[in-house]
Regions:
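Short, glycine-/small- and polar/acidic-enriched structural segments
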Residues: 2-130, 137-140, 156-162, 175-181
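Pocket-lining segment of extracytoplasmic ligand-binding domains
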Residues: 144-212
Length: 212
């Protein structure tokens, strides 16, 4: 039995993994696949790939490309979701900001540096024509940290997946003032180089199951 650990955010995108695990489809192929939730997002998963805490990650395209370029010993083996990810731009419900163009000098809540919330804030700033070097960030760890930072006034806006944050918009915690879709496929599957070298066929089996 081969042990493999897969990382992903606890969001609807990864429901197929929960279903295939529940159905014991990996065990039937002599693979003990374990799922690990990463509420901290892509930055946390990139770190986990580096340390060997996980073997496979369902990770944001922009996050893993940046980290591989910075030395992460992993490879992208396939696209997981081809459509763009829609990043909502959120402020506190009581904020004076009314549109995303107002946010040039505002403090941005991010889960961590190198995360999707960090990189997409840069993409949004670039699209708005702002000076990237002058962006101000507040590291908050995860979605709950973003909620707390906006409610407590520690940051001015927070970018997170549109539909994941919709309940917080609906109940009046956040106010969404814009969206910023990624100009690339949103999620890819990344695997540590060591795992590809030693368990390539098992990785192929995992991908075949999740793609079916």
């Amino acid at each position: 039995m081969v042990d493999l650990t897969v990382a992903g955010v606890p969001e609807h995108f990864n429901y197929p993994w929960y279903v295939t695990l529940k159905n014991k489809e990996y065990i039937k192929n002599n693979i003990n696949l374990r799922w690990k939730d990463f509420p901290g997002g892509s930055g946390a998963m990139c770190k986990a790939l580096r340390t060997g805490e996980v073997d496979i990650a369902i990770v944001l395209t922009e996050g893993i490309i940046k980290d591989i370029a910075a030395g992460n010993p992993s490879k992208i083996v396939q696209t997981y979701i081809e459509t763009p990810l829609i990043w909502g731009i959120h402020v506190s419900a009581t904020s004076s900001f009314q549109k995303k163009e107002d946010l040039e000098h505002a403090t941005i809540a991010i889960s961590r540096f190198g995360s999707g919330s960090h990189l997409m804030a840069i993409v949004n700033a670039h699209q708005q024509g702002w000076n990237i070097e002058k962006l101000q960030f507040k590291v908050v760890g995860n979605l709950q940290g973003g909620i707390d930072a906006l409610v407590n006034g520690e940051a001015d806006y927070f970018m997170w997946e549109h539909f994941t944050t919709k309940p917080f918009v609906d109940n009046g915690i956040f106010r969404r003032i814009g969206d910023c879709p990624t100009p690339w496929p949103c999620f890819v599957v990344a695997v540590r180089d060591e795992v590809l070298a030693t368990n390539f066929k098992d990785v192929q089996t995992v991908l075949k199951i999740i793609n079916t």
